[in-house]
A protein has these predicted regions:
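Conserved donor-binding/catalytic core segment of Leloir-type glycosyltransferases
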Residues: 2, 154, 180, 190-207, ...
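Membrane-proximal helix-turn-helix segments that form the acceptor-binding/catalytic region
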Residues: 68-75, 125-153
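Short alpha-helical donor nucleotide-sugar binding micro-motif in glycosyltransferases
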Residues: 75, 147, 256-257, 264-269
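Acceptor-binding helix/loop patch of EC 2.4 sugar-transfer enzymes
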Residues: 102-141
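Nucleotide-activated donor-binding/catalytic signature segment of Leloir-type glycosyltransferases, i.e.
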Residues: 239-260
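Aromatic "clamp/platform" in nucleotide-sugar-dependent glycosyltransferases that forms part
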Residues: 277
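Short hydrophobic beta-strand element within catalytic cores of glycosyltransferases
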Residues: 294-297
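Conserved small/polar residues in nucleotide/adenosyl-binding loops
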Residues: 319-321
């Protein structure tokens, strides 16, 4: 199994892959090995599986080659490669391995990479139809080539299935919605004078966390607390912005937390915000809803669909984000 993020990282793949790996291992008695990028040393982490971590801070070319070689090495005695990240590297390694590939698609890595580096401003859908220069066009072609080499693609939404079909994918596509465990107790919202707002996210630009911090600053209320759970390349910039805000003492960066610590914050949250420019079907949003927390989210991916007629939360206009 290949994945770009894995616990203690926070994010959809880091939530999903351990669950499905545990099911394959414990219920089906499959032999599982996981390859991921990480900021941590293997010796510092207690895993339930065989996990190989590659330092994501290595020089990009060296890291890329090391990842391909490691996938090849681990995959030689395996029957199947399950790809939930590191898709291009897995595809190249599989040219030599010739194994079956099942791939989970939750977005467009070419769009996310270009957007996070501020090379584009277009939305997910606009990106698919617009013509770009050589660099971005090449990345789009590589992404399409990699996806089309999969034997089966699994995706959480019809929107993403349409995206995959438009790439020219001819093999089987399965829509399997993301799921969460229902907690035994729900949050008690608005039970005191403080309003606790929570975000659980990778700290990357398309999540629009900077804009949420600025909006909270504009409200300038000592009664509003913003809990930001997660880590990522935008952390230092977001912390700098929060220190310049009107209510810096009420904006808390929790970093990476264990599941029980996140659950504790959910139990004390009044509002959950998901303000991304794109999502497939976000685990964190579903988890917040499972606690009965009112949610505010942008109408991207399947978010609008799962909110129904705003009886489970409210839609934020992308224009106002």
């Amino acid at each position: 199994m290949t994945v770009g993020i894995f616990p203690p990282d926070i994010g959809g793949p880091a939530t999903f892959v351990p669950k499905i790996a545990k099911y394959f291992q414990d219920e089906l008695n499959y032999e599982i090995e996981i390859l991921t990028l990480s900021d941590n040393k293997n010796s510092n982490i207690n895993d339930d599986f065989s996990v190989k971590r590659i330092d994501r801070n290595l020089p990009i070319i060296y890291r890329w080659l090391k990842t391909i070689f490691t996938i090849y090495k681990l995959g030689k005695n395996k029957d199947l490669i399950f790809v939930n990240g590191l898709g291009t590297e897995a595809t190249i390694a599989n040219i030599f391995l010739k194994k079956k590939i099942i791939r989970k698609i939750v977005g467009d890595p070419a769009w996310e990479r270009a957007y996070s580096k501020a090379k584009i401003s277009e939305s997910f859908d606009e990106f698919q139809i617009k013509n770009y220069g050589f660099s971005i066009s090449f990345q789009k072609k590589v992404r399409s080539f990699s996806i089309k080499k999969s034997d089966i693609v699994v995706t959480p939404s019809q929107h993403l299935k349409n995206f995959i079909l438009n790439l020219g994918f001819k093999n089987k596509i399965e829509i399997i919605n993301n799921g969460v465990f229902i907690p035994e107790e729900n949050t008690n919202i608005f039970t005191n004078d403080q309003i606790n707002i929570t975000i659980v996210s990778r700290l990357v630009s398309h999540k629009n966390i900077e804009k949420i911090i600025k909006a909270i600053s504009d409200l300038n209320s000592p009664l509003i607390n913003l809990n930001i759970i997660g880590d990522g390349p935008e952390l230092n910039q977001l912390q700098k912005i929060s220190l310049e805000s009107n209510n810096k003492d009420n904006i808390i960066f929790h970093g990476k937390l264990k599941r029980d610590e996140i659950n504790h914050i959910f139990l004390n949250s009044d509002i959950y915000i998901q303000a991304s420019n794109y999502e497939g079907l976000p685990h964190s949003l579903l988890e917040a809803m499972s606690y009965g927390i009112p949610v505010l989210c942008t109408p991207v991916g399947e978010c609008k669909k799962i909110l129904g007629n705003e009886d489970r939360g409210y839609i934020l206009s992308l224009i106002h984000i």
